[in-house]
């Protein structure tokens, strides 16, 4: 059994230490230890009270996810926690680090809670498709009130110690030795009273909420906005409703237990846990040893002060890394720094940042007009627009002025990293870092490995990704990398559906009902239809079939949100899309001119074609080795492209419906379009053998990766 609980006697106080490194989950051995050691302390007449702490730098991380679905060993969690809650002697939880999920639920079974200043508490189970199943939905509302408890549980965001003290979750904050402070706190309580509070008995805030319909209405609105399509949030709300309405604590616990089981058996739980582990696996590069030496990144530079450059600079500053923002246009530089300051001020205005914290991060950002100022930076990220010649020119300058061991990174969404590194004397230090806009908000970071990028550079950048709180995924250097290459197939099918008879609103609504954050035509309007149109006109290129409708709209000066009309119409100052029936003549004419007879198309066909277009291209990326593993592509699509987390990403989704069924649908679509719908050989092999994408790639199925001189043709 995993984990143990250590026992130490300090005078008349028993100190129990949960020891299950690195984060002390409530594994089977820990549960046995809690029962045994609490019995020992309660049976020792020399013990007056108990301090419960965690070993190392964590209190208790919560349930052991690796035990889910396994045969139960030892007592269940509820039995172990009852031993704490019904302890004859008062218990104080000494929280030394994170107390999340079952960790906080354990602490809520104690009579008192004291924590270090840097500790955090929270109930993040919703992020795994679950609800707090060890009493959290019943105990937390009794301390902070139902409304605040619902916000904590539905957001899944940890609460810092000071805020937790203000809310009443904590009774004290330790500024010295935590265990000694906990013992002193407990001695004081023992001297003051013989009645020590049990959270389960605190009903005042629940009674106050009875009959207040706003509490549940606000929670449902929050869940609908921030957790669209997810199952667990609704179950959390039902649990808190039971806490409010039930006079019997155990009846509320029974409700929580029943609804927890529903979440546990729901397919969303498996999908979201897949993403939880997938993000951790993505950080491991198969041929880069775990002990590879990394460079210290103590300072950074960013070339370009536009939206992307400013967002990247904020990432460094937020992590406490001084950053120089360079732009040789003084007005652009002033504007860019002004936007950064405005972004931070918005956070202050919304209560997400203190003025002192804002001043601190702004002090880490230094504007500059001179390349020489970047000389001592440990890393410089180029963040100018997508033009290979311009980027090569910048990298030549950086190679001349920045110290020789510094990493040079290009924020490119699809250009050849090897072509960029070729102009430097340090190709082993050059890497692609594809941030997603807005870079200070979007979590995804595609790290692009060039032919000569060293293992040390890769290990350093992957570590940096964690420091700046990104979901980092490595891609080989190939056209479109992972995300944008998969996107080609998705948008191609959306455009083909428009030619064949669907309307933008139908396509967008079908895909948003599936769970996508934004439909493809709303996204195209947001980005701007004129970007590709202008580029093609400038280069005198023929318009591809799939862009003919968008280009026809541009000829009518319908560019998207920027001028209030594109696939949709937009009211002044609003981003809300309204139907544009006047466009239908254009759709019909372009379709007829290109030999299409428009027809009725079902929502099911829309979803299948767009999503399976992603999946088939993903299979090709996997067989080429551009992505290391299928879960990496799921991480990319959930964190960068608005794919619903509760479906587990496109590759997991395909596995869940069965690759044999995926292949069957693709073959059916291929009857009308053999070029686009040629199934990946990897998909065919896996489908015919009952396999899943997690089984791939294997050496016998690997193919040569797409080269930059090749075109992705559909």
Protein language model annotation of sequence segments:
Residues 103-106, 110-112:
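Active-site-proximal alpha-helical scaffold in enzymes
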Residues 123:
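Small cofactor-carrier domains centered on a conserved lysine used for covalent cofactor attachment
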Residues 11-19, 29-71, 82-96, 116-120:
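A structural preference for short, pocket-lining loop segments at secondary-structure junctions
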Residues 2-3, 19, 71-75, 82, ...:
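N-terminal glycine-rich phosphate-binding loop for ADP-containing cofactors
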Residues 5, 47, 60, 296-297:
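A broad structural signal for short, well-ordered beta-strand segments within beta-sheet-rich domains
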